[in-house]
């Protein structure tokens, strides 16, 4: 069975048992009345069952309801069908004030019907020939308004300075100021020029997201013809069907696939209603993607540390034990489905490097947009500053130093021999994003 954990907030006067049963019925075989065609099938075989209810500590009138769905209710290899069944209709139920899908347990038999990420973590490292450290990226800013040539120039400067990747922002598709084909050509030129100068393999996340699946595939094919290593997709706005099709194409044609989670906070930010990002992350691993944005813990976007590390493990590891202290409701066995690299992006700069290296480890991408392009000396020095900071943190960690305790000292020591890093540290020494997280663990 597929197991689901729902956070249920019943209307006043509705007992939790009735609410849990209603969720199970509405998201499987139930309807609002008895129908004569019920007698033509075995409802006991196909109906969802609410098998456990527990109150949420500190939250009156909120309950975690566990529902089991028989596997025959779902089409093989279809995240679209899985979500249509489990969350398609039930969230508008009048008997509930609010409903949130907290976690899913995907059984091994169902996991094996998915291809998952096009390549996975180890294959990506082998393709890039980069080991033993996090990868570095940069989102090109301003996200909208640059011409294709100026955009490509910014990519080249960042890659030449020491970054591994540059990135299209999620809303860069094919607008009047920069059509997609022009952008692809200038970015490919930036990749090849910077590779020739640095001797390192470089990439730019070319956003193939489009208004139709046919147009999306046309852009992916053009990227492959240019010989670039990686493309990008906005998987929630583009849809799971489009994403799975693109992931299959990338696997067959040797392209890495970077996934942006644009629109996720509409779905996952409210604590009592919606779908938790750990579910969206599991769905992405099944649908297919080699990278996905996962929050930063320390930057400008929502992300509490234990919760973030919980779904980072769900993205990368092969077997994850149940651990309610990190928000993981079920043990998940991925049976060797390739892993996804988490991407930390949003309001981060060189002072965050020790914390990011310590939190995310080597199998991650650390992406500095404003933290590269905002350098007072220009884009290439901004990239140099980030690369120096990363190398200093990795070396210190490998020497046994504690990044959580000595992080600022390590960065200051590196500033003595890197004027680019010293200038970056001076610019961003006062910038902090200190707000309470909306989504927190139940105590």
Swiss-Prot record:
Name the residues that bind substrate: 89, 139, 143, 261, 293, 345
Q: Which domain of life is it from?
A: Eukaryota
Q: Biological process (GO) annotations?
A: photorespiration; reductive pentose-phosphate cycle
Annotated catalysed reactions: 2 (2R)-3-phosphoglycerate + 2 H(+) = D-ribulose 1,5-bisphosphate + CO2 + H2O; D-ribulose 1,5-bisphosphate + O2 = 2-phosphoglycolate + (2R)-3-phosphoglycerate + 2 H(+)
Among InterPro entries, the record links this protein to:
RuBisCO (IPR033966), RuBisCo_large_chain_AS (IPR020878), RuBisCO_lsu_C (IPR000685), RuBisCO_lsu_C_sf (IPR036376), RuBisCO_lsu_fd_N (IPR017443), RuBisCO_lsu_N_sf (IPR036422), RuBisCO_lsuI (IPR020888)
Q: Write the Enzyme Commission number(s) for this entry.
A: 4.1.1.39
EC supergroup of this enzyme: lyase
Maturation and modification:
The disulfide bond which can form in the large chain dimeric partners within the hexadecamer appears to be associated with oxidative stress and protein turnover.
Q: Which cofactor does it need?
A: Mg(2+)
- Cofactor remark: Binds 1 Mg(2+) ion per subunit.
| Positions marked as site (Transition state stabilizer) | 300
GO CC, one annotated term: chloroplast
Task: Family membership, please give it.
Answer: Belongs to the RuBisCO large chain family. Type I subfamily.
**How is this protein named in the record?**
Ribulose bisphosphate carboxylase large chain
Q: Which organism is it from?
A: Callitriche heterophylla (Large water-starwort)
Q: Which gene encodes it?
A: rbcL
């Amino acid at each position: 069975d597929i197991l689901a954990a729902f956070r249920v907030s019943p209307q006043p006067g509705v007992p939790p048992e009735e609410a849990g049963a209603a969720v199970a019925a509405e998201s499987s075989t139930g309807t609002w009345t008895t129908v004569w065609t019920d007698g033509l099938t075995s409802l006991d075989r196909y109906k969802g069952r609410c098998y456990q209810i527990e109150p949420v500590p500190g939250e009156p009138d909120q309950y975690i309801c566990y529902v089991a769905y028989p596997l025959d209710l779902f089409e093989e290899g279809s995240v679209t069908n899985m979500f249509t069944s489990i969350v398609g209709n039930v969230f508008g139920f009048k008997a509930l004030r609010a409903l949130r899908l907290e976690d899913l347990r995907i059984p091994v038999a169902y996991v094996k019907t998915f291809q998952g990420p096009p390549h996975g973590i180890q294959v990506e490292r082998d393709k890039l020939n980069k080991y033993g450290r996090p990868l570095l990226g940069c989102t090109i800013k301003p996200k909208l308004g640059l011409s294709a040539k100026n955009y490509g120039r910014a990519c080249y400067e960042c890659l030449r300075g020491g970054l591994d990747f540059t990135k299209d922002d999620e809303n860069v598709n094919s607008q009047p100021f920069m059509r997609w084909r022009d952008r692809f050509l200038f970015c490919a030129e930036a990749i090849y020029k910077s590779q020739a100068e640095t001797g390192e393999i470089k990439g730019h996340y070319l956003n193939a997201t489009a208004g139709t699946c046919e147009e999306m595939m046309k852009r992916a094919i053009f990227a492959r013809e240019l010989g670039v290593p990686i493309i990008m997709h906005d998987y929630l706005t583009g849809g799971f069907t489009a994403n799975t099709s693109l992931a299959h194409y990338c696997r067959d044609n040797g392209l890495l696939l970077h996934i942006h989670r644009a629109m996720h906070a509409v779905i996952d930010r409210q604590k009592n209603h919606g779908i938790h990002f750990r579910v969206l992350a599991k769905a992405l691993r099944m649908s297919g993607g080699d990278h996905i944005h996962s929050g930063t813990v320390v930057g400008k976007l929502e992300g509490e540390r234990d919760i973030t590390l919980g779904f980072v493990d769900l993205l990368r590891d092969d077997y994850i034990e149940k651990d309610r202290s990190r928000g993981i409701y079920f043990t998940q066995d991925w049976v060797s489905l390739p892993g996804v690299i988490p991407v930390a992006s949003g309001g981060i700069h060189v002072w965050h490097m020790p914390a990011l290296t310590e939190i995310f480890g080597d199998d991650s991408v650390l992406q500095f947009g404003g933290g590269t392009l905002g350098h007072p000396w220009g884009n290439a020095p901004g990239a140099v500053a980030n690369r120096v900071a990363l190398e200093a943190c990795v070396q210190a960690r490998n020497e046994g130093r504690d990044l959580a305790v000595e992080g600022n000292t390590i960065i200051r020591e590196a500033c003595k021999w890197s004027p680019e890093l010293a200038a970056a540290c001076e610019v961003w020494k006062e910038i902090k994003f200190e707000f309470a997280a909306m989504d927190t663990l139940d105590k």
